[in-house]
Regions:
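Conserved loop-alpha-helix segment in the C-terminal half of the alpha/beta-hydrolase fold
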Residues: 232-272
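Catalytic histidine-centered segment of alpha/beta-hydrolase-like enzymes
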Residues: 269-281, 285
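Active-site loop/oxyanion-hole signature of alpha/beta-hydrolase fold enzymes
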Residues: 37, 70-113, 117, 127
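Flexible "cap/lid" loop of the alpha/beta hydrolase fold
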Residues: 134-171
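Conserved HGGG/HGGXW glycine-rich cap/lid loop of the alpha/beta-hydrolase fold
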Residues: 35-83
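Short glycine-enriched nucleophile-adjacent loop
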Residues: 119-130, 136
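Conserved alpha/beta-hydrolase catalytic His-Asp/Glu region
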Residues: 147-148, 153, 168-225
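Alpha/beta-hydrolase fold catalytic core
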Residues: 1-44, 64-68, 89, 108, ...
């Protein structure tokens, strides 16, 4: 009997390391890569749709002397192969993999700063995995994007329009897509010198990943989850007279859509379009310092 028990224990000793190795391997992200800089409390930076991690270059430089900065690059965006994002949904699986990354690296309630789709992803993590995150900064993103298309939108009513947009992106010729991205960046970035790089990131993005990620953002409504979020959340939003009529109501849009989130801090950044960190670098850096303290 003891001999048999010894053999079982020996076998178990072989199996356990294999199992642990498999678990560690499973925790390796397939939907993003990460570049880690600095030492200290952990801060995760998530870029927006079709953006490179380099959109956070100035922020990473600002923080890396005092914090350990985790720069996310979403698979399929800005030249990175699609990897695990090659098919199916993008945003929710991305959030789940970031949570797995936090757990596997034993990060202690990291702060997360996310822009646009990255901000939505950060909200998703805070609402569905509150144990994983310490605080969140959302940069120019709403809990339900599609209210910007129609304030009465629901996830169900917007789905056909979201599917149509997804299919349009997939069906465009390279020339039409490039022209469209150039026009789009004129409305998203106020600083002309910053636009060409953002356009280049978009053109290097896997269009299938972009289209499906856009569909995800358009059809996922987190407003009903806000009341349950206990994580401290700061929301920065762009505000500029060149936005036209939106300039006068953007504050109300953010206030009404985040009304259910306890203790949310809503902070306008004047003189910026959607890429706040590129248009108002000093103001954005100051907001990051306030957020971290």
């Amino acid at each position: 009997m003891f001999k048999t028990l010894k053999h079982l224990l020996a076998l178990l000793g072989l199996i356990l390391p294999l199992g642990l190795a498999a678990t560690a391997q499973a925790a390796e992200p397939t939907r993003f890569t990460v570049e880690v800089r600095g030492k200290g409390p952990d801060v995760i930076l998530i870029p927006g749709l079709a953006s490179s991690r380099d959109v956070w270059a100035a922020t990473a430089k600002q923080l890396e002397g005092r914090y350990r900065v985790h720069l996310i690059q979403v698979a399929g965006f800005a030249g990175l192969p699609a990897g695990g994002n090659a098919e199916g949904g993008v945003v929710e699986p991305l959030a789940d993999e970031i949570v797995a990354y936090i757990a596997s690296r034993r990060l202690d309630h990291p702060a997360i700063i996310g822009h646009s789709m990255g901000g939505f992803t950060a909200l998703l993590i805070a609402s569905h995995h509150p144990e994983s995150v310490g605080r969140v900064m959302v940069v120019d993103a709403l809990p339900f994007f599609s209210v910007l298309i129609n304030p009465e939108s629901t996830a169900e009513t917007i789905a056909p329009q979201a599917a149509g947009f997804r299919d349009m992106v997939l069906g465009q010729s390279p020339e039409a897509f490039a022209a469209g991205q150039t026009r789009t960046m004129e409305g998203l970035i106020k600083t002309p010198a910053a636009r060409p790089q953002a356009v280049a990131w978009s053109l290097a993005t896997d269009r299938g990943v972009m289209a499906r990620a856009t569909y995800d953002v358009m059809t996922n409504d987190l407003r009903g989850d806000l009341a349950g979020i206990k994580t401290p959340v700061t929301v920065l939003y762009a505000r500029d007279p060149e936005m036209g009529y939106v300039y006068g109501i953007v504050g109300l849009i953010y206030e009404s859509n985040y009304a259910a989130l306890p203790g949310v801090k809503l902070r306008p950044v004047n003189g910026a379009f959607h890429f706040v960190m590129l248009d108002q670098r000093e103001a954005f850096a100051a907001e990051v310092e306030t957020f971290r303290h």
